[in-house]
Amino acid sequence: MEGIFAAYVLPALIIALKSVVLLVVLLIVVAYLLYADRKIWAAVQLRRGPNVVGPWGLFQAFADLLKFVFKEPIIPSGANKGVFLLAPFVSAVLAMATWAVIPVNEGWAIANINVGILYIFAISSLEVYGVIMGGWASNSKYPFLGALRSAAQMVSYEVSIGFVIVTVLLTVGSLNLTDIVLSQNTGLGTMLGLPASFLDWNWLALFPMFVIFFISALAETNRPPFDLVEAESELVAGHMIEYSSTPFLLFFLGEYVAITLMCALMTTLFLGGWLPPVDVWFLNWVPGIIWFMLKLCFCFFLFAMVKAFVPRYRYDQLMRLGWKVFLPISLFMVVATATFLKVFGLA
C-alpha cells in the first residue's frame, strides 16, 4: 500500500498542488497586467486611469471580478444554451492549460516534458474553438461574424508562428523549453568573442523571426491593431456581444491569459527565459523567476504600447500581411537557418 502511495498518489498530489499554486499566481499576475494595460493606455491619452479602488487603483481588477460574478448571466432566447455556456470554459481552460509546461525558473515547471513547445502549439491552436462555439451558439449575426473572423485570423498567423518555432528548434535541437533557455547561455555574442550577455539570446541571431513572432502574437491573441474579431466600430464586441456576468469574465480571462502566455513564450524563445542580462556575480544572485517576470512585463509593455499607438488594420490588410509577407519570410528563414547550420557544421 505504501508503495502505491509513493508511486502514484503522492506524485499526483504534488502535481495538483503545483497546479493550484500556478493557477492562483497566474490569476493575480493577469489581474495586475490588466491594471497595467489600462494605466498605460490612460497615460497615453493623458488620463489617470483606474484610481478609486485601493491605493492608486491597485485593487480595481478584483472589484471588476466581483462585479461580474454578482451580475445575472443572461442567455439569449434563441441561443444553444449548452454550447453557449460551455464556450467560455473551453476558452479559459485551454488558455490556462498551456502554462503547465512553461519554465519560469530552472526546474520550475509543472511538467518538464521533452515536447513542451509542441504541446503549447497544439493546445493554443484549440483555443479558437471556444470563440467559434460562442459566436455560433449566440444565434446572432454579429457574434457569428466575429467568430468567423477569429477562425481565419488565428489559423493564418499560426502558420507563421509555427515556422518561427521551427527556426528556434533548428538552432537549439530540442523541443524542451528548459533546453531552449539554457542554450541561450552561449550564442552570437559568444561566437564574436564577447562575454556572456543578452547578445547571446535568440532575439539577435534570429531578429527577423523575433519581429514576426511578436506581430503574429498580436494577431493570434486578437490584440490591436489586429482586434478585428471584436472591432467596436463594426461588431461591438464580436463573439462576446451576448455574454454577461461570469461567462463574459471567463472569455476575458482566457484572452488575457493567452496574451500572458505569448509574452512568456517570447521570453523563453528569444529573451533568455530566467537568465540574467549580463553574466556578472551580483546579477546571478537575483532569483531567475525575477528576471523571467521582468522580461514578461517588458513584452507586455510592448503589447500595450502597440494598442495605444497603432491604428486598426483592415481585414484584407490583415490577411495580406499574414499570407503574403510573414509566410514567405518565415519560410525563407527556416531554409536559410537550416542551410547555415549545415554549411558551418553546427547542425
From Swiss-Prot:
Topology term for the membrane: Multi-pass membrane protein
Enzyme Commission number(s): 7.1.1.-
Subunit text: NDH-1 is composed of 14 different subunits. Subunits NuoA, H, J, K, L, M, N constitute the membrane sector of the complex.
Biological role stated in the UniProt entry: NDH-1 shuttles electrons from NADH, via FMN and iron-sulfur (Fe-S) centers, to quinones in the respiratory chain. The immediate electron acceptor for the enzyme in this species is believed to be ubiquinone. Couples the redox reaction to proton translocation (for every two electrons transferred, four hydrogen ions are translocated across the cytoplasmic membrane), and thus conserves the redox energy in a proton gradient. This subunit may bind ubiquinone.
GO cellular component: plasma membrane
Family to which this protein belongs: Belongs to the complex I subunit 1 family.
Gene: nuoH
Biological process, per Gene Ontology: aerobic respiration
Membrane-spanning segments: 13-33, 50-70, 82-102, 115-135, 161-181, 198-218, 246-266, 286-306, 325-345
Protein name: NADH-quinone oxidoreductase subunit H
Keywords, sorted A to Z: Cell inner membrane, Cell membrane, Membrane, NAD, Quinone, Translocase, Transmembrane, Transmembrane helix, Ubiquinone
Compartment list: Cell inner membrane
Broad class of where this protein is predominantly found: membrane
Keyword Transmembrane helix among UniProt keywords: yes
MF-aspect GO terms: NADH dehydrogenase activity; oxidoreductase activity, acting on NAD(P)H, quinone or similar compound as acceptor; quinone binding
Superkingdom of origin: Bacteria
Catalytic activity: a quinone + NADH + 5 H(+)(in) = a quinol + NAD(+) + 4 H(+)(out)
